[in-house]
Amino acid sequence: MFVDQVKIYVKGGDGGNGMVAYRREKYVPKGGPAGGDGGKGADVVFVVEEGLRTLMDFRYQRHFKADRGQHGMSKGQHGRKSEDLIVKVPPGTIVKDEKTGQILADLVTHEQTAVIARGGRGGRGNSRFATATNPAPEIAENGEPGQERDVILELKVLADVGLVGFPSVGKSTLLSVVSSARPKIAEYHFTTIVPNLGVVETGDNRSFVMADLPGLIEGAHAGVGLGHQFLRHIERTRVIVHVIDMSGLEGREPYEDYVTINNELKEYNMRLTERPQVVVANKMDMPDAEENLQAFKEKVGDEVKIFPISAVTKQGVRDLLFEVANLLETTPEFPMYDVVEESEASVMYKFDAESLKFEITRESDGTFVISGYDIEKTFKMTDFSRDESIRRFARQMRGMGIDEALRARGAKDGDIVKILEYEFEFID
């Protein structure tokens, strides 16, 4: 089964917790703090495996959660960093953030890697918080939460040449004649429902990969007839071979087919029209084909070069392959996406720097709800089992301006303040 789009969940490993510990050694009075830092959580890393051809495996496993870092230990020992979680994907995979639509990675070459969900850093042990005024702190941080997100994986086949056209114009037959590929061929529409790839050798030591793409219909750019699923596979091709049925047996007019398919390519993605297109008049072995070809030439004009062929008898196929090979030698690749490098601040929330700190809303029962990347991260990294850590968290909230903001919103003594799923009492 060919699967070319899936949605999965990925989560980087949480950082290990820092430790509160003290040096206890004979003849060393007042040894001081000796709690180690936690280890970094593992990243979720996508790696291209050239042997894969489909996203089928992701139908059965949709959640990928990396291991957390090891906790800090006594005697100043830091926790171990966890090994990254490796997820193998086929070449041609594009990774998008499901929430924002941002392109995270375009993976095309063997063993190419991309970090899709970063692991959190380890929490600091109490030895990190020692000062002249507080030489034996009872403070340690929890590990930073790992990044988590839903992502969309899209597979766009890696081919140099794409065969496009209406259903039943002979694309699959042409591919089977010029390569060792054996696509399904039958006398009904949409026999081809998944892309078929074949390696074409021209006989003069040149070769290229050709893709037989499922037939298009009018409205494909808007998703009609699974158009989006089919058209995405054209995006990576460098040369488009437009196959047109000249027999007239399907009751369609060749010029109308030509215009309709080109409009679909243009409407789907403007850059598809930048690629060189080879127009192929197929089924020239049929009775009315020559007459239909002459009428077609009159309508398209002399500027369009047409290759009359018969995929069944192989008439004209050799000249077609040489033309395609010549075009490939002079046509560069067309990058479809600019992958944006993420900064840590933009990993999960796409706001400006100020809005990342916190936001205060009020529920119908009067509870104040505080949310935002910075405050939630600070909250998760606080060890609330220790009084000194709680006091530090209160100072951090004041430093962010949360106390003042709550007063400005009308908060009074005894009001309930909520962060994530935890509730606190506001004391002025």
From Swiss-Prot:
Superkingdom in the source lineage: Bacteria
Locations listed in the record: Cytoplasm
Stored InterPro entries: G_OBG (IPR031167), GTP-bd (IPR006073), GTP-bd_Obg/CgtA (IPR014100), GTP-bd_prot_GTP1/OBG_C_sf (IPR036346), GTP1-OBG_CS (IPR006074), GTP1_OBG_dom (IPR006169), GTP1_OBG_dom_sf (IPR036726), OBG_GTPase (IPR045086)
All residue ranges annotated as the Obg domain in the record: 1-158
GO CC annotation, single: cytoplasm
EC number: 3.6.5.-
Keywords: Cytoplasm, GTP-binding, Hydrolase, Magnesium, Metal-binding, Nucleotide-binding
Matches recorded under Pfam families: DUF1967 (PF09269), GTP1_OBG (PF01018), MMR_HSR1 (PF01926)
Subunit structure, interactors included: Monomer.
UniProt protein name: GTPase Obg
Origin species: Bacillus cereus (strain G9842)
Encoding gene, per UniProt annotation: obg
